[in-house]
């Protein structure tokens, strides 16, 4: 599959979707994107910058949601203009899609909306690549139905069906907890869509701090290594210059000054894993 200006798939090096959870300010966004660009260019990792203009799904109604659509999209357009990077953001309702798609290179659907058929259809008809997140409540094999919905809508609109990615971000395991079943990454390959692993939301503790979500960022490297060892087309990781001061999802954000070391390890592992065919393909 061609994404932005690079090929993605199990026969390609993993690509990275990374950035702050939410757009907090223009300067921090440009600085963070610039640093990530430097790291990824050094390691030859294809890179898409992500950040949200609005966090519609918050634990508390008093939580920071963002700078608003117009300002958030303006700042993301500056990332494209100043740094020459492709950008991704999430959309939360059908009426947002057209405006967002006019700015960003890739759309993302929130995990909680993966079963909303009209919403998935509308995203697919935008003409943009779409990173479709698997709901925390969904079995991995059920993602085939979700991807098929997107492809059907694209085909009916006369658009390419080869624009959709399936993203794993953990599954609910009791109250305020998520776990990652690495088998799901192999199962989701049956969608014939590139599989992406969200290593930071997978360590989230939803609502774990009462009015906000907690997280265990120390396990991001553990799960990221496991996902790369399993074999994925891409990785999704949120980062922040100072996670303790992040306005959203700080507890599960990778410190920006540790991203280089983490990615260096993951690149080495990815190269080793993809050197040979995946044995599981021949076991049945």
From Swiss-Prot:
What cellular component GO annotations does this protein have?
Answer: cytoplasm
List the catalytic activities from the record.
D-arabinose 5-phosphate + phosphoenolpyruvate + H2O = 3-deoxy-alpha-D-manno-2-octulosonate-8-phosphate + phosphate
Which domain of life, per UniProt?
Bacteria
Q: Where in the cell is it found?
A: Cytoplasm
| Keyword vocabulary terms for this entry | Cytoplasm, Lipopolysaccharide biosynthesis, Transferase
The UniProt entry's GO biological process terms, in alphabetical order, are: keto-3-deoxy-D-manno-octulosonic acid biosynthetic process
Give disulfide pairs as residue numbers: none
Q: Would the keyword GTP-binding be found if you checked this record's keyword annotation?
A: no
Q: Which InterPro entries match?
A: Aldolase_TIM, DAHP1/KDSA, KDO8P_synthase
Chief location of this protein within or outside the cell: cytoplasm
Per the record, the pathway is: Carbohydrate biosynthesis; 3-deoxy-D-manno-octulosonate biosynthesis; 3-deoxy-D-manno-octulosonate from D-ribulose 5-phosphate: step 2/3; Bacterial outer membrane biogenesis; lipopolysaccharide biosynthesis
Q: Which GO terms describe its molecular function?
A: 3-deoxy-8-phosphooctulonate synthase activity
The record's SUPFAM superfamilies line, in alphabetical order, gives: Aldolase
User: Which EC number(s) are documented for this chain?
Assistant: 2.5.1.55
First-level EC class = transferase
One of this protein's Pfam families, by short name?
A: DAHP_synth_1
Could you tell me which NCBIfam families the record lists for this protein?
KDO8P_synth (TIGR01362), PRK05198.1 (NF003543)
Family in the record? Belongs to the KdsA family.
Question: Protein name, please?
Answer: 2-dehydro-3-deoxyphosphooctonate aldolase
Species source reads Burkholderia cenocepacia (strain ATCC BAA-245 / DSM 16553 / LMG 16656 / NCTC 13227 / J2315 / CF5610)
Q: Gene name on record? A: kdsA
């Amino acid at each position: 599959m061609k994404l932005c200006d690079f090929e993605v798939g199990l026969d390609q090096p993993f690509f990275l979707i990374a950035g702050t959870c939410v757009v907090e300010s223009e300067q921090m966004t440009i600085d963070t994107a610039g640093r990530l660009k430097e790291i990824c260019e050094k390691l030859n990792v294809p890179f898409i910058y992500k950040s949200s203009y609005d966090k519609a799904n918050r634990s508390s109604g008093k939580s920071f949601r963002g700078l608003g659509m117009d300002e958030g999209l303006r700042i993301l357009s500056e990332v494209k203009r100043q740094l020459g990077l492709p950008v991704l953001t999430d959309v939360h309702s059908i009426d947002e899609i057209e405006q967002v798609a006019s700015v960003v290179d890739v759309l993302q659907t929130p995990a909680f909306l993966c079963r909303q058929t009209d919403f998935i259809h509308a995203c697919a008809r935008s003409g943009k690549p779409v990173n479709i997140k698997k709901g925390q409540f969904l079995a991995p094999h059920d993602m085939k139905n979700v991807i098929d919905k997107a492809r059907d809508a694209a085909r009916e609109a006369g658009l390419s069906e080869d624009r959709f990615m399936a993203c794993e971000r953990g599954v609910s395991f009791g109250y305020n907890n998520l776990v990652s079943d690495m088998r799901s990454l192999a199962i989701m390959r049956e969608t014939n869509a590139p599989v992406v692993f969200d290593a930071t939301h997978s360590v989230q503790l939803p609502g774990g701090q009462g009015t906000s979500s907690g997280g265990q960022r120390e396990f991001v490297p553990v799960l990221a290594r496991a996902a790369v060892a399993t074999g994925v087309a891409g990785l999704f990781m949120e980062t922040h210059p100072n996670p303790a001061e992040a306005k959203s999802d700080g507890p599960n954000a990778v410190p920006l000054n540790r991203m280089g070391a983490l990615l260096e390890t993951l690149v080495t592992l990815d190269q080793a894993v993809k050197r040979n065919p995946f044995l599981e393909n021949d076991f049945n």
